[in-house]
């Protein structure tokens, strides 16, 4: 139970509702900012604006997956109010206050550092990334079906990257009967690809391996599908770029070549917001319990 913990949930989308539900069930005291259009009420949760939060008492601040903009504006799907997280807000929190977000940016990292508050980027955690790979691959399958006129079974698929998401995608597409090859750099990843019964190749040789593929799925957050590589692709190839914005594809050149390329980060929150929210809620409740234990609340 999180009885006695005071938590500010500032902004967010449908995923945040699962977090709020979990934390109220565990009897935390919740302040909700950016939820004024939400009809559903949560026992133990109080709707307010950001300047009404008693920051001096707040044990944790939970931001949306997207954190803030470069100016500190927080995304609020359930409100038309502009919510801005400022340095002054963090300065007023207790020294033990922890800030959670999915990702981060220079603005958020700077104000957290200036306030000397711990900032936890949840999407850097292995457990969340691996759990999130499940709705991610389901969303990727959905996009592949929607944007092709052939079955995944028997298609030629290249997956770029064998990280926490890439591994799940490669395994699942292979299970659906696709002919999957996977591009990676490290010798350990290339060995793992072989062990999985898939075809490995080094990303330095990417240009040679994209000539005959139907679907290219990128998980590498750097410009890997550049003009040189795209010039080797045929217009029939579908590119699904799952990397964080701006992705790893030269989208303008792909369009010029007649190649359909889709940037699709954040699929869990789009195709399965309830599950994605539950993943975050379960991990957050454990992390908050640790804070509670440390503070003896």
UniProtKB/Swiss-Prot annotation:
It catalyses: (S)-2,3-dihydrodipicolinate + NADP(+) = dipicolinate + NADPH + H(+). Its EC number is 1.3.1.-. It is an enzyme of class 1 (oxidoreductase). Induction: Is not expressed during vegetative growth; is expressed at stage 5 of sporulation specifically in the mother cell compartment, under the control of the sigma-K factor. Is repressed by GerE. Keywords: NADP, Oxidoreductase, Sporulation. InterPro entries: AlaDH/PNT_NAD(H)-bd, Dipicolinic_acid_synth_A, DpaA_N, NAD(P)-bd_dom_sf. GO terms for biological process: sporulation resulting in formation of a cellular spore. SUPFAM superfamilies: NAD(P)-binding Rossmann-fold domains. Pfam families: AlaDh_PNT_C, DpaA_N. NADP(+) binds at residues 164-165, 185, 203, 242-244, 264-267. Disruption phenotype: Disruption of this gene has no effect on vegetative growth but causes a sporulation defect, characterized by heat-sensitive spores devoid of DPA, which can be cured by supplementation with dipicolinate. GO terms for molecular function: oxidoreductase activity. It comes from the Bacteria. Dipicolinate synthase likely consists of DpaA and DpaB, since both proteins are required for DPA synthesis. Together with DpaB, catalyzes the conversion of dihydrodipicolinate to dipicolinate (DPA), which constitutes up to 10% of the dry weight of the spore. This is Dipicolinate synthase subunit A. It comes from Bacillus subtilis (strain 168).
């Amino acid at each position: 139970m999180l009885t006695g913990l005071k938590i500010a949930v500032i902004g967010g989308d449908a995923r945040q509702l699962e977090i709020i539900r979990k934390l109220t069930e565990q009897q935390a005291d919740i302040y909700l900012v950016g939820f004024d259009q939400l009809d559903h009420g949560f026992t133990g949760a109080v709707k307010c604006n950001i300047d009404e939060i008693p920051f001096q008492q707040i044990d944790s601040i939970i931001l949306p997956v997207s954190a803030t903009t470069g100016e500190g504006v927080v995304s609020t799907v359930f409100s038309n109010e502009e919510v801005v997280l400022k340095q002054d807000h963090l300065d007023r929190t207790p020294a033990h206050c922890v800030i959670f977000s999915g990702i981060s940016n220079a603005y958020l990292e700077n104000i957290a550092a200036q306030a000397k508050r711990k900032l936890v980027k949840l999407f850097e955690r292995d457990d969340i990334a691996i759990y999130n790979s499940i709705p991610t691959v389901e969303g990727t399958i959905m996009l592949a079906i929607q944007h092709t006129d052939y079955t995944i079974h028997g298609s030629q698929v290249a997956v770029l990257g064998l990280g926490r998401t890439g591994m799940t995608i490669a395994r699942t597409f292979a299970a659906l009967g696709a002919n999957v090859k996977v591009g990676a750099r490290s010798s350990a990843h290339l060995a793992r690809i072989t062990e999985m019964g898939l075809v490995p190749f080094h990303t330095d040789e990417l240009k040679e391996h994209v000539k005959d593929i139907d679907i290219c799925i990128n998980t590498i957050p750097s410009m890997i599908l550049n003009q040189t590589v795209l010039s080797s692709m045929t217009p029939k190839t579908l590119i699904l770029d799952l990397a964080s914005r701006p992705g790893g594809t030269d989208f303008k050149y792909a369009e010029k070549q007649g190649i359909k390329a889709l940037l699709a980060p954040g699929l869990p929150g789009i195709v399965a917001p309830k599950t994605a929210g539950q993943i975050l809620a379960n991990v957050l409740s454990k992390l908050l319990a640790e804070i509670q234990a440390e503070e003896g609340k």
